[in-house]
Swiss-Prot record:
Glycans are attached at N179, N246. Residues 19-291 are annotated as: Catalytic. Residues 297-318 are annotated as: Disordered. The active site is at S136. The lineage of its organism: Eukaryota, Fungi, Dikarya, Ascomycota, Pezizomycotina. The keyword Protein biosynthesis does not apply. It catalyses: feruloyl-polysaccharide + H2O = ferulate + polysaccharide. This is Feruloyl esterase B. InterPro entries: AB_hydrolase_fold, Cellulose-bd_dom_fun, Esterase_phb, Plant_Biomass_Hydrol_Est. PANTHER family: FERULOYL ESTERASE B, UNNAMED PRODUCT-RELATED. SUPFAM superfamilies: alpha/beta-Hydrolases (SSF53474).
Amino acid sequence: MAIPLVLLLAWLLPTVFAASLTQVSNFGDNPGSLQMYIYVPNNLASKPAIIVAMHPCGGSATQYYGMYDYHTPADQYGYILIYPSATRDLNCFDADTAASLTHNGGSDSLSIVNMVKYTISKYGADSSKVYMTGSSSGAIMTNVLAGTYPDVFAAGAAFSGMPFACLSGAGGADPAMSNQTCSRGQINHTPQEWAAYVHNAYPGYTGQYPRLQVWHGTADNVISYTDFNQEISQWTTVMGLSFTSNQTNTPLSGYTKMIYGDGSRFQAFSASGVGHFVPTDVSVVLDWFGITGGGGGNGGGSGSTTTTTSATTTSTGPTGGCTAAHWDQCGGNGYTGCTSCASPYTCQKVNDYYSQCL
């Protein structure tokens, strides 16, 4: 039986005009030789927000697009998605060269920023609502962009990353490279030294740095949990924030949400027993960015139970005669360093794996 033309068109239109992930060939200067993919929803908001979503090593833009569903909420809220795709070093983003770790230095970080500028210009996007997220290599790149282009990004969410500049000079960013000093958690600096790497990436910058969420699994055997603790100390020092409290079983059972300051600028999530890498909770990320919430990121999940505990003193006695300075680590499962804090500070438990002189 013949199908009436009107019914045929009604069936075809949603398929023909549905938004899809599309490659952009000419977005501007591309010193990192990255590929750019973009998702622009049909229901585009006036002055839409932008989310840059970055894949892990060995991944691609199309792979990461399919891994976590940011595009369905984009259809509802009208934001634009940018998916950079790395093409070198086992498809890892450049987080080790001076070019990528320097404001306007070039390489991958500048390529991604030029993708953002292209999108703002072409679609009238809101330059004050540019966000970034990623897993593993994408999480490391989130830290890189937060340090090198704090004037471009408003907030970020990094899943299983490491501190800014931890890979500096490593000669590569893939997990199989010979120099695994950073990924094994063997690079240790004071919080002030970690913060200096960030400040030196953009000399003269005096504005705010992006609000950040960092997530890490305690059983990560690719990027050490120590890197998570260093990541926390780096950014809380840059932002001038102190540990406030823990919220257990948030947003899932076994996860601990760590609040710094009032929780509006920096949050950390420790996932007990989770390996590499922590799965992305899209709803929590969108809330943190302010797309579905107020931008403070309450981090609650359906069915989760939350208890709040303030920092507690774990040790003030010396071990081996050494003393940890203000902000330094002083305890935690597997920790073998100084447990005595310089006066007047005390060693306060942040979680089972990390205590800090506060």
